[in-house]
Swiss-Prot record:
This is Succinyl-diaminopimelate desuccinylase. One of its GO terms (biological process) is diaminopimelate biosynthetic process. Pathway: Amino-acid biosynthesis; L-lysine biosynthesis via DAP pathway; LL-2,6-diaminopimelate from (S)-tetrahydrodipicolinate (succinylase route): step 3/3. It catalyses: N-succinyl-(2S,6S)-2,6-diaminopimelate + H2O = (2S,6S)-2,6-diaminopimelate + succinate. GO terms for molecular function: acetylornithine deacetylase activity; cobalt ion binding; succinyl-diaminopimelate desuccinylase activity; zinc ion binding. The keyword Zinc applies. It comes from the Bacteria. The gene is dapE. PROSITE patterns: ARGE_DAPE_CPG2_2. Homodimer. It comes from Buchnera aphidicola subsp. Acyrthosiphon pisum (strain Tuc7). Binds 2 Zn(2+) or Co(2+) ions per subunit. Belongs to the peptidase M20A family. DapE subfamily.
């Protein structure tokens, strides 16, 4: 089994599918799914490749993932070619090994074993795969979700294969994620010579008190599932590097990660009220990434915990920490959503790698979840 998983992972890693490119990864996966009786619906949008695969009827268990990867960074910093996967000391190295081509290989091989053992399984087993998760995420999973909702074709349970684990596979699972919204604020002034400040209007001087007020906003205190919402500066810029020029504008980008205690509209009003209450000329652009979502204890979480405990003899920690994931789109369908994947300590880094034994363990967990929900 390990060889089968590893070989599939290596095939996928060897394809330089930097987001949103797929470059043939999905063709490999689709071929294997077709061989075990899955129907395929491609939902391609612009440069993004998406597909929905399903087998059976009834309550639907979906495995969701992505074939795209982030850029490699500096090639010279890698010990090996990031798109020529190699095995060293029990680890598989390559871009996407942990995030998340290794998990894709674990899913597919788990499905192959499950279907072989239970060809007439109850319910429906499905896959939702995209090549637009790591970049804009506008043409990816959300488009498949919209397609399914237009057909009134709903997902009941979903396992997202994002690398949720911290030290060992299954020690942490994500049963929700915070929402995310970005505010791009430009404070406009009047450029001038720094020796004649009375002839200019310094946007930095006017902007700093406003920035501090925004950072001091307390949106909420969190709840049983989420930490308190946070406001952080992601980027700030003014001036052109000359020490004798007052800049004409100041740009500051805030990112807000928010809990289920507040809405994006409340966040927007809080920030806009501060801007309007100060004597500044500003413009603002909002980028909304997704609402918070939470899956409370139910059949899916109970099943995932049961499978993890079977292999690890220890229950996982339920967490909503970290960034956004495509689970936020699937949750719009009212689905129970849990993220269970590989260890995340090398994701997006140079020399990304995953233990071969972890690939096997994750695939076994996935198969056990299929068996417990569908057999």
């Amino acid at each position: 089994m390990t060889c089968s998983i590893t070989e599939l992972a290596k095939k996928l890693i060897s394809i330089p599918s930097v987001s949103p490119k797929d470059l043939g990864c999905q063709d490999i996966i689709i071929k294997r799914l077709c061989a075990i009786g899955f129907d395929i619906k491609r939902v391609n949008v612009n440069d993004t490749k998406n597909f929905w695969a399903f087998r059976g009827t009834g309550k639907t268990l979906t495995f969701a993932g992505h074939t795209d990867v982030v850029p490699i960074g500096q090639d010279k910093d890698w010990q090996t070619d990031p798109f020529q996967p190699v095995i060293r000391s029990g680890y598989l190295f390559g871009r996407g090994s942990a995030d998340m081509k290794g998990a894709l290989a674990a899913m597919i091989t788990a499905a192959e074993r499950f279907v072989n053992k239970f060809p007439n399984h109850k319910g429906r087993l499905s896959f939702l795969i995209t090549s637009d998760e790591e970049s804009s995420a506008v043409d990816g999973t959300i488009k498949v979700v919209e397609y399914l909702m237009s057909k009134r074709d709903m997902i009941d349970y979903c396992i997202v294969g994002e690398p949720s684990s911290t030290n060992i596979v299954g020690d942490v699972i994500k049963n929700g994620r915070r929402g995310s919204i970005t505010a791009n604020i430009t404070i406009h002034g009047i450029q001038g010579h720094i020796a004649y400040p009375d002839l200019a209007d310094n946007p930095i001087h006017k902007g700093l008190p406003v920035i501090l007020k925004i950072l001091s906003i307390k949106l909420d205190s969190g709840n049983d599932f989420f930490l308190p919402s946070s406001i952080n500066i992601a980027n700030i810029h003014a001036g052109n590097g000359f020490n004798n020029v007052i800049p004409g504008s100041l740009f500051v980008q805030f990112n807000i990660r928010f809990s289920s205690e507040v809405s994006e509209k409340h966040i927007q009003s809080q920030i806009v009220n501060i801007l309007n209450s100060n004597d500044i000329n500003y413009s603002i652009e909002w980028l909304f990434s997704g609402k918070p979502f939470i899956t409370k204890k139910g059949l899916l979480i109970d099943t995932v915990i049961q499978s993890i405990f079977y292999f690890n003899k220890k229950k996982p920690i339920l967490s909503t920490s970290g960034g956004t994931s495509d689970g936020r789109f699937i949750a719009l369908m009212g689905s129970e959503v849990v993220e269970l994947g590989l260890v995340n300590n090398t994701i997006h880094k140079v020399n990304e790698c995953v233990k071969i034994s972890d690939l096997k363990l994750l695939s076994c967990m996935y198969e056990d979840i299929m068996k417990n929900l569908l057999s």
